[in-house]
């Protein structure tokens, strides 16, 4: 891993006063961002700059900052959680960006996640998913083996567990092109 350096970035961030107001992208310039800092630390740095300029800081969700809770979910440059794969927004580091880059930051774009303010969305849709069981059940009329009776090799089970470890970030719902499908429990 290379040594941390400072970069200057341009930010285009979704701003929206409340759920009823119309939002828009606003531009910001942020200098001396350490490539060792996390994406959320960069947003903290921007908010500190805005407060010092007597401007309204950007509202964004976060909690654990360890990739456990899913609260930090954002679209970054049009991708859920940004340019890296297999991570949440809080696990994204600024070393993924270059000096002079323009970074677009938006809240989840889904009817299931209405914007409350800026980058903060209403996540109550996950309560409905959990109440619905979070899966689609199929009536097999007793003609198939019970899934619990089918042995699965440990290697396959370990790989499946990694893919199934949901932290409730909502990326699956926010990015699903089939979000209005009748069987889609997240819609």
Write out the residue ranges for each language-model feature.
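Signature of N-terminal electron-transfer/Fe-S-associated modules in redox systems
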Residues: 1-187
């Amino acid at each position: 891993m290379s040594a941390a350096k400072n970069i200057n970035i341009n930010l285009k961030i979704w701003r929206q006063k409340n759920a009823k107001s119309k939002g828009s992208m606003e531009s910001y310039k942020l200098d001396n961002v350490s490539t060792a800092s996390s994406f959320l630390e960069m947003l903290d740095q921007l908010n500190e700059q805005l407060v010092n300029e007597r401007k309204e800081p950007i509202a964004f969700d976060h909690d654990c900052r360890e990739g456990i809770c899913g609260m930090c979910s954002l679209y970054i440059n049009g991708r859920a959680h940004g340019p890296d794969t297999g991570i949440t927004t809080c696990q994204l580091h600024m070393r993924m960006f270059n000096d002079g880059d323009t970074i677009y930051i938006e809240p989840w774009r889904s009817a299931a996640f209405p914007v409350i303010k800026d980058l903060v969305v209403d996540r109550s849709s996950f309560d409905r998913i959990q109440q619905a069981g979070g899966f689609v059940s199929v009536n097999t009329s007793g003609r198939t083996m019970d899934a619990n009776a089918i042995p699965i090799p440990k290697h396959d089970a370990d790989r499946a567990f990694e893919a199934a470890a949901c932290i409730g970030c909502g990326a699956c719902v926010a990015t699903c092109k089939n979000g209005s499908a009748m069987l889609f429990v997240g819609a």
